[in-house]
Amino acid sequence: MNDLNLRVAALKVCAHPKRFAELRDALVPLPNTWIAAPHDFVLQFAAAKSSAEQVQVVKDVFYGEQAQDHEDVAHFLADLLLASPLKHAVRNQLTKLFSDNALAKQNASPHRRHSKEHLLEALQQSLGEMANSLAVITPPVSHERTNDVFVSANACLQNFPFGREALGKQVHRFAPLLTTALERYWADICDPTLELSPTRRNELYLYVQNALRFLVSLLAEWSDKLRLFEDQRFPGTSNAVAQKVARYYDTPWDVRSIAALLIGHLARFSGTFKAYVEDCSRPKAEQDVPIQMAALLVLRPVDYTENATLALAILKRIVAVSELKSTVTNLLVFLSKHLFIYSKSLGEMHAHLPDDQKLLYQRILAQLQVFALQNISSDTDSVRHMSSALLHQVLQHAQAAGQEELFQVVYRQFEDRAAYLNASCMALEQLVAVAGVSKSIENCPSLFGVIFPRHLGCEDCVDALFKAMMVSAHKTEPFAEWQSRWFGLLLAAIRVPEKRRQVIEELIAQAVQLEPTRLAQVLLPDDRLPLSCKLAAILGVRQLSARRQNLLRGMKEEVEQALIGLDDHTRLLALRFLVETPRPSELLNADQMGAIELYVRHNANNPSAHLRQLGYGLLQKALKRVHFGLVEYRKSRTPASQEVLQFLIRLIRTLAQNLFPTANYGRRWLSLRLLRDCLELSEMVGITFSELGIELPTEALMACLGDSYEHNKVLAAQLLERFQSHSLFKPDEMIELLLSLRPSDSATGAFQLQVYCKASRVQSEMPTPTHGGTIHEPLTFRALQWCLQHLREGLRLAQLDLGEAAKLNPLYGLLFASRHLLQQLKLKELAKEPQWRQYIDELVTMCLAVSSVVLPVVSSASPEGHLPETCDQETDQPLTNVLDRQLSREELLQVRTTPQMILLCAWRSSKEVCLILGELVQRAPLEEEEDEEQQQQQGDFLLSRAQLEAIGEHFLQLLAETKHRGAFEQAYVGFTMLCRRFWHSESVRLNQLPGQWVDEAMAMVSGQEEWAGKGARLCATRRSAGMPFMLQALVGTELKLGTHATLYRCMNRLLEVCERRTGGAAGITARSHALNIMRALFRSSELAELVTEFMARGIQCALDGLLLAEEWAERNSATLLLAALIVRVFGVERARLETGELHVRNRMTGRIFFTRYPQLFDYFHAALQRESEQMDAGGGGSENASGKRRQAVQLEAMLLMLSRLYPSSLEGAESTLNLSEFVPFLIRICHSHDLMTREMAALVVANFVTQEQALAEIRRIVVELKALQLRLKNTEAANTKLNTNVLHGQLLLLLHLHRLVRWTRPSLTRMQLHTLAELAAPLLQHDACAFSALVAVMVAAMEDAVEPGLLDFQLLEQIGVVYLLNHKEVQSRCQQLGISNRFYQIFGLHLHRLRGISQGIVLHIVEDLAETIWALDELKVELWLYILLQRSLSEQNSLVSEQDIEHFEFSRDIRRYFETLSREQREEVGQELYESPAVRSSVLHMMHMIKSSKNSCWSLQLAGRLAALQTLLRDPGLELNQLVQRCSEEHSTHQEAGLLLGLRRLIGESKMLERKHWLPMLNYAQRLVHPGQPVYLRHQAAELCDSLARNHLRDQLVAGTTDVDIGLVGRFSGLVLLLLHDDAEWVRHRAVQLVCGAGLRTRSGAGQEQEQSAMAPLILPSALIPPFLDTMIGKLTFDDFNMVQRLVDIIAEPFTTADAMELFDKQENNHYCERNHVLTELWDARGRADPRARTPTIPTGYQIFK
């Protein structure tokens, strides 16, 4: 009821929920009868400025003492209450005042107090006047006014006792009005002459529902009073209208249910209830279901004495309808909801039935159970939930009545597998909730015999059932039995690899929560359980937290192993286990601190941002515990606190070591933040660096200032500022960076300058004179003056020659440094000193001058190619990439000036100017905001009025004229800062400026004559360039004020410009600008939901622009706007599903869409109707080709939006805005002349129709196709011309509809195939395109024909005729239209499959596809390769994996064909292909043709597939020598996969690999692991290395080998290091498996030999590298140290070459590898192997800081 009233109230004003919220906060107008009243309380209410003030006035008027007119107060308040919108604050307050509680709170004198009788009289009078207002006006009052009166009066029944009582006295007035209103509503709905729009009809249905609901409420409350009413029209007329409403097919189900309830109440009211129930029990049509359902709902417990048999009969009819219409979702939603309501009323029925009718009660419950069990696993959420609740209610009634039979039904269904597993488990779960566990276990032995062992951890329904039964059993079973049965089953399931471990862990945690102490004793000692399971259980149970210290000691080795293990989930659980504790003040112990250090050491370089954030959060918890330890250390130096201090020291040193120059981003990110936290922690406690015994890692932090990520620069600068007193930076080096052409160098120089200015002592002084007059930040002032000096020099050069300035002094670095230093200062303090004020003045002047110099470049029509006249006009100077390396000044003079260099200088300088000016306006004291006296005395401001005007005009000019996107985007940022300051300014003049700019901008955009000159400056291309950004800044910054007036003003003006359709060039330009600006506003995240109410009009403008636009510019803008609106409505585009369908997050139900944008329903309805009528009329032959195309584009765009909608399960339940309304028009649009339109329309139809509608449409199409086939069979009609567009559209529609219904009606699908087979031959002669669509429909049906018996022999013979057509003719006709004949080959494949003869399938695949006509087709190669890959995958020691199959990207039709084959057919076909000589000869022949032919028809993809296919044959004809030779040759990347498969096969088959092949293959693998190669090839390189290491290189890689090939071992080790540092995680993990599985890691201690096995635990590469290097280096026992050094040099070669330095140090292709860290690990391993080894000399700048 409340939800309905909310919808009604929203409809009274508008349909948009946001506007409805505004309605509730808007002012309540005075009732009409009180507008001219002179009373004081009326005037007080009228003077209120907000809804809050109105509420206060109402309270004051009620509780205050009115000197006069006291009698009128209650009447006024009653009128005001009924006139207020529902849920409005004023109405809510008045409802509270008209109550006994409010009367008790009155403090006025007795004679001026309100009494209950007086208030009831006022309410009664107001209700009477409101009813009279509908009865006396002629002509009749509008439907809207009538509905408002009924809704307001009906609200008196909702939590309003006074209103209910007053309404009861006026019920005789409203009953006839309701009857009359229902007649009027229904007459308008049924009147075809009115031509109601869909939304208007929907409103009328809502009015009908409100009137019916009100009438039902009156009958339920005051039927006795209504019987005294003498007007006989009331029951009869109301019943007649209700009968029509309840049976009308177009009526929403909610309205039909209310009408049916009214029929039942009227039957009881009229004394015909018995006849009414008898009539409902008879067989009825489907449209009578609501009336039958209402008959059950209106039954009272006492009625069952006479009507129990009839009630059972009615229920059986309803359940029968639900079985018959099981695919009609909205019907099932209606029935499930109302049957559940009905079941709740059956509790008292049993007591009123005589003993001889008790059986009827059981049969009623059984019928309800039948419905519940049928729909308990429905795909519709509401049906599923309601059916579950219904079954629960039925079982409760059965338990209370002692009816065990209903429980046995559920048991039998579960045991007999009579329903799907999901349905059986959900039903049993409801039974367990009612009857407990013991009987379920007794009656369902398959629970523990089959279901739980097989499906637990794999099926959600089984998991939910197990959890419910386990929790319930814990309450009744002894612990030993419960543990053995339930917990033991979980422990067994967790060990099965196929189970979902996380689900089982959650169940185990749930079990441990039930018995924390005893289960922990069972769980923790079990070594067979994974550690993640134990940790999840411990962390989930608070009672075990106290024992965590003891648990850690017992699991120390396991936890440490988990911290460096490959499983991310286990690593985080282990870290949580270490750091989380119920008492944050609990100190870390030695084991925990050591484990945390281990985690930081090996997880700092994790490239995953998600895991990095989670790990950092947990480490912060550890630092909080460290803080408590340091506090204790300051108080009393206990051993535990001293240990914490030492841990902090070690942690700081580790973090400092992590900041080496080549550290990857993840390591720097985590280390800088933890280092900051640690240093702040020590500073907070008061522990100095000297006390810590460490020094700040100055060199490392200084190197971090050159980081490519600015937030890392910020952190490093903050640490240096805070903890470094002496700066080592030199001014000449900093200015060199600031003058660099590389923006990253400029940023580095600026941050160095920041640190330099904050230091208390500097090593080199600034080459500028000191200014003794400056008190605030003198060093920063000198630095800024220094930058300003160089800026002046650069500006002078730029004014003379911008090209030379772009090379020698590009300006933007100095501007960035100036802005960066100003950000560190408090500008209010600067305003107090004249020197600072003068500097700001000079800086603003300099910025404006720089902008004027670069403006011609960024405002050029082609900024990317703009080259102004320069002194350098030489054309023979060399081109140099000046951004790759720093050049000297002399070298730069010799570099040719290019447009790109000038553009870089121009737009980045413009960017910095805009940001400087914007930040100054936002933060600096302004002249206009200072007090006048203060200005005269001190003048403490930084920006004057004139400067503000100049800055404002500068931004407006940039945004209006700039063409370069980077420039106007940054101008937008600066202008946003300015607008934000002006909107919030206390200066009236400044506060008004943004509004004036909006008006001017709107005038320019709309093309007003007085602004025509300025409007010409706007950029008509580049999406209006900066103009949308200007409006976005002006609109977005106003939001902080809490008002949206500017947004509404702009949007309405822009929409009016588009809707006005002014002719001429000016109108086209204005609409283009308006569309582009609206696109920016709709995309703005700041405006969020504020623009939602304009989106419907925006969509209409965009679609109209596609149809009516005369120029490409307007059409382009309309297209971009529509794309932005689609993203705003349906969300950011996500990856499509494998079937090609849109992601569910990018779709929406039609109910939600048209509830948000109801006016679009009428728009789409009218547009589709117009298009369909034109289709029927012949397509509008009077239009030209251009007009047709524009019309098709608009229609395609509309269909694109509609294709994202799908029917709701509540379709037709509460609204008539149903998607099915569009289907008749869309079916006719499928006949469009445009191919894309036909395809989209067919897809949308299939999305919108139900299964029943789809079957009906298929029948219609099949009949029409049969008629066409008979017509074409006539020899005279064979030459008649067909409308191929219509035919093709029908076939497309048939295809999509078949995919919806599949083989649900086998007879219809057989008839469809028969008709299409008969039509194929004549259709090929007319149109190959239609023929391809026909065959596609047949293929779709044949694909789904998997079950035996669907197609008989006769039908297969008829279908086979299609494949007997002349193949050459098929190919020829397809080539004429540019159509691939692949569809015909797929058809042949399925035809032979359905014949069921495996030898025939093989014969077709091997021989038919090898015919000359198919020789150049790729299908057979793709099919052969896919079958052989699947065959190899099924073998025990498979040569291939799923990654190989994914790599070749097989098409869906091939994958679908293989899935339709039976298991036996797959095995037989695969074996035949594997052994077939014909396949082998065909493959070798095609490969020879590819090598010898230069024909372009041979694609690289085909060549790659052939190379892979050859390796999978029984006799591939490959020789290892040839493959090894190919490894050293250059060839296409597509062929690498086949080459690798061949190598791995021959290596695996060879018992011994010749030594000469070792190095070539390792070199080949090293080429494959280059970061520029695809991830698949890098993974295959790891597989190749694994094959070599396990089988052929093992003798060289094990310890104790005397004949060691240093080059071989070194190459292999370097290759493994590259794999361990690969950017792709799955490649790194495969390398870890290689090292651990091949026994290439050593661990100290006993059992070392056993560790060299495949059972070695898999750990992170960072933890695996040291033992791996120890194995590879330490096993050499040579006395000659040079041998070890040579091995180390070979291993290090991939990381020390110039190419490696360029590749890894930039971290462009590989973000994980840290070259310097690898070399350090290598040299450390050498030192461990030979202590005599000297420390190597590491290149300058690459040391690791220690």
Swiss-Prot record:
Record carries keyword Endoplasmic reticulum: yes
Tissue: Detected in the larval fat body, salivary glands and wing imaginal disks (at protein level).
Keyword entries, A-Z: Coiled coil, Endoplasmic reticulum, Phosphoprotein, tRNA processing
Top-level lineage group: Eukaryota
Knocked-out gene: effects: Flies are hypersensitive to the cold, hyperphagic and display elevated triglyceride stores resulting in an increased resistance to starvation. Heat production is impaired and flies are slow to recover after cold treatment. The size of the lipid droplets in larval fat bodies are significantly increased and flies display increased feeding. Total body glycogen is also significantly increased in adult females but not in males. Mutants also display an increase in calcium-dependent SERCA activity. No effect on levels of circulating sugars, glucose and trehalose.
Example GO BP: negative regulation of endoplasmic reticulum calcium ion concentration
SUPFAM superfamilies linked to this entry: ARM repeat
GO molecular function: calcium channel inhibitor activity
Phosphoprotein as UniProt keyword: yes
Coiled-coil ranges per UniProt: 1252-1286
InterPro entries xrefs: ARM-type_fold, THADA-like_TPR, THADA-like_TPR_C, THADA/TRM732_DUF2428, tRNA_methyltransferase_THADA
Subcellular compartments: Endoplasmic reticulum
Pfam family, one: TPR_Trm732
Protein's job: Together with methyltransferase Trm7-32, methylates the 2'-O-ribose of nucleotides at position 32 of the anticodon loop of substrate tRNAs. Plays a key role in energy homeostasis by regulating the balance between energy storage and heat production. Functions by negatively regulating Ca(2+) signaling pathways that are involved in heat production and maintaining correct lipid storage in the fat body. Regulates Ca(2+) signaling pathways by reducing the activity of the calcium-transporting ATPase SERCA possibly by promoting uncoupling of SERCA ATP hydrolysis from calcium pumping.
Protein family per UniProt: Belongs to the THADA family.
Binding partners and assembly: Interacts with SERCA.
Protein name: tRNA (32-2'-O)-methyltransferase regulator THADA
